[in-house]
Amino acid sequence: MNKSIYALLCLLLLISFAAAAEKKEEEKKDYGSVIGIDLGTTYSCVGVFKKGKVEIIPNDQGNRITPSYVAFTETERLIGEAAKNQATLNPENTIFDIKRLIGRRFDDEEVQRDMKLLPYKIVSKNNKPYVVVKVKGEEKTYSPEEISAMILGRMKEIAEASLGKTVTHAVVTCPAYFNDAQRAATKDAGVIAGLEVLRVINEPTAAALAYGFDATGDKEKNILVYDLGGGTFDVSVLSIEDGVFEVRSTNGDTHLGGEDFDQRVMKHFLTVFQKKTGKDASKDKKSLQKLRRAAENAKRILSTSPQTQLEIENFFDGKDLIETLTRAKFEELNMDLFKKTLDPVKKVLEDAKFKKSQIHEVVLVGGSTRIPKIQQLLKDFFNGKEPNRGVHPDEAVAYGAAVQGGIFTNEEGTDTLVLLDIAPLTLGIETVGGVMTALIPRGTFVPTKKSQVFSTYQDNQDRVSIQIYEGERSMTKDNNLLGKFDLSGIPPAQRGVPQIEVTFEMDVNGILHVSAEDKASGSKESITITNDKERLSQADIDRMVKEAADAADEDKAAKERVEAKNTLENYIYQIKNTIGDKDKIGGKIESDDKETIETAISDALSWLDVNSSAEKEEFDEQYKILEKIVQPIFSKLYGAAGGSPNGAGEDMPNHDEL
């Protein structure tokens, strides 16, 4: 990509938002200081842009990252270090890893698996996971949004203590592969915390801002951001030039990170302990919490030392756990997970249409990228290229979020920055035959607004159902239903005549709004896809993309079959309407010819009734049979009138049907 393309993109953005900018100038709000928050699975971080640079704000313990822990005791609620420090004594009432629950369904396979390893109780409310704790002796349930809000509230307090003023606006990060429900839930958590979330920004994009903000020179650079944190994994390819950050592709796994590596270590030592003592500690919550902390600490030490020792006094049933863990053993326990992270790396390169050699920098983000084997695997994959460790792995995401906050407040040094992010999955509606008709293809820059005109499937149809789907397959049955609504009040008309404009609008946070309007009557309905809709689990997203690749030929054949059927059916009804119009051809056609056509139409409709599941070739053959009968008659009529010989329905609208 050269400078002229970047300049054109910037110009288009300026033109698109010029009117809105004028209006905003009149009613411009004073946001005050807009903070950037990295709401992490295991740790969170907050920063602010001021005086031309980003400041990462330490908490009251002097630490620049804060554990994403919330605990409830008999007398108080604890957040951060204080909550984590008492976790082994109060495991049932200490909440962590809440990011792995936010925006998910209770029956999600990954939620069910996590429940077996988490010491606190999780219950279902309308198929959403809620945590159950004892608060001052009474049992209470909290949604993941509420727990997340407590952590966000703590980060807000940390910022306010440093800035000496109230903070009301923030930019919050989330994994690039978070779906709509997870993004909406993250925004909701901000509202609960008393923050207006101006933007939900993708974590690898934020990290790229951190990397590129101080970069000198205007030469185009392609970077791959490899973001492996405590609970989630993202990888994105971006092109950076002249302050424009363009996301080219993104992929990841919202349920893969350092916590999974810890769990492998925990399972290993539970097995070792049972073999040596004959005692099973896997169901004891206090023992598990002790082991979880020891495993996390061992993992950290092994990033710089070849071995370490776990020492847990009175681990279970009066027995101590004292064992050695080598780096080699740690790598053996997790090698399949380490290698699993390379699959999304391959996918983003493929989606961006880049070769390995076209990536100028591989930027490491997230605490888990400190693991030497991870760094070695990436170096080998990129043919010996050393990964870039120039950004702070724990702080880069909050840094980028703070830069975005600075853009909102027009801070010095941010005026030339332009960020172009993308939609992670294709969005569309169902049309006749169960076809997925895409309005926003995967990889489209956001924010975006796309409209398309559709029509009715039956004569005098007074309402249509708009069903919204997300996924990569060509048939809706293989994709995920996000929501649906009906548009009624359509004036009676022949099929294919009404014009129904469907508009998809995705905002900068990746949240979707859909509307439909009948152009004749002005009747309009809309829906915002929000967190209360049943949404995808990460497994669903991964399955969709994989199945779409595996079943591309099958998808193509199914779509072609439906299109062939629709073409035949439309042709039949166009002919029927044409010969029935007495003011035009219907009034000029000879009775014998009309009878011939009516018989052919009747035969074709009867064949369709019996053979609705026929193959594409059979529908094509029926079309040719009908055309062979009808075409000579219409050609004769149009020839006599000096008109077009192409006959039936040449003035009929040609829209996909709902």
Swiss-Prot record:
It holds the Pfam family HSP70. Residues 1-20 form the signal peptide. Keywords: ATP-binding, Chaperone, Endoplasmic reticulum, Glycoprotein, Nucleotide-binding, Signal. Disulfide bonds: none annotated. It is found in: Endoplasmic reticulum lumen. Glycans are attached at N611. The keyword Cell inner membrane does not apply. PROSITE patterns: ER_TARGET, HSP70_1, HSP70_2, HSP70_3. It comes from the Eukaryota. GO terms for molecular function: ATP binding; ATP hydrolysis activity; ATP-dependent protein folding chaperone; heat shock protein binding; protein folding chaperone. One of its GO terms (biological process) is ERAD pathway. Its main location: endoplasmic reticulum. One of its GO terms (cellular component) is endoplasmic reticulum lumen. The keyword Endoplasmic reticulum applies. A motif (Prevents secretion from ER) lies at residues 655-658. Probably plays a role in facilitating the assembly of multimeric protein complexes inside the ER. PANTHER family: HEAT SHOCK PROTEIN 70KDA (PTHR19375). Belongs to the heat shock protein 70 family. This is Luminal-binding protein 2. It comes from Dictyostelium discoideum.
